[in-house]
């Protein structure tokens, strides 16, 4: 497991490929939500530029709005420390133009914020 968030929602980001030409990481993203008799699960692959990853971590460390997006704007993870909210969304379009979209919003307490911050700061960067 490369990056794992377990509170307030389960999100796993595993690196499956690296591109040194355009510094970027291909992540296998898994999001699992289970509460109040509701269950949703998302599994997809997304390319994220290393610069976007660094900016996301930097903003989190400064207590600012932090946004992690893939290169196609199909995946987004937003940590808003002022509002105390974690938002996520995943979208995939098939070859016929059909779209599947999953998204969620979760309240964050201080422990969850610190756990997310630790998970991203502990990721060993190669760039």
Segments predicted by a language model, with ranges:
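Charged, alpha-helix-forming regions
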Residues: 1-37, 42, 46, 112, ...
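Charged, amphipathic alpha-helical segments
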Residues: 7-15, 57-62, 70-74
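Short linear motifs in intrinsically disordered
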Residues: 15-23, 55-58, 76-81
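Short C-terminal domain-edge/linker segments immediately following a structured domain
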Residues: 43-46, 60-63, 78, 118-123
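Amphipathic protein-protein interaction modules
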Residues: 64-107
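Mixed-charge, glycine-accented linear interaction segment located at domain edges/termini
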Residues: 95-127
């Amino acid at each position: 497991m490369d990056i794992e968030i377990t509170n307030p929602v389960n999100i796993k980001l595993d690196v499956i490929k690296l591109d040194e030409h355009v510094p970027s990481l291909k992540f296998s993203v898994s999001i699992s939500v289970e509460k109040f008799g509701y269950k949703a699960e998302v599994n997809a692959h997304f390319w994220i530029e290393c610069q976007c990853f660094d900016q996301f971590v930097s903003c989190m460390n400064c207590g600012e709005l932090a946004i992690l997006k893939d290169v196609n704007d199909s995946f987004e993870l937003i940590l808003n420390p002022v509002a105390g909210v974690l938002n996520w969304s995943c979208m995939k379009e098939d070859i016929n133009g059909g779209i599947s979209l999953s998204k969620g919003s979760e309240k964050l307490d201080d422990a969850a914020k610190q756990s997310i911050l630790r998970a991203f700061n502990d990721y060993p960067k190669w760039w």
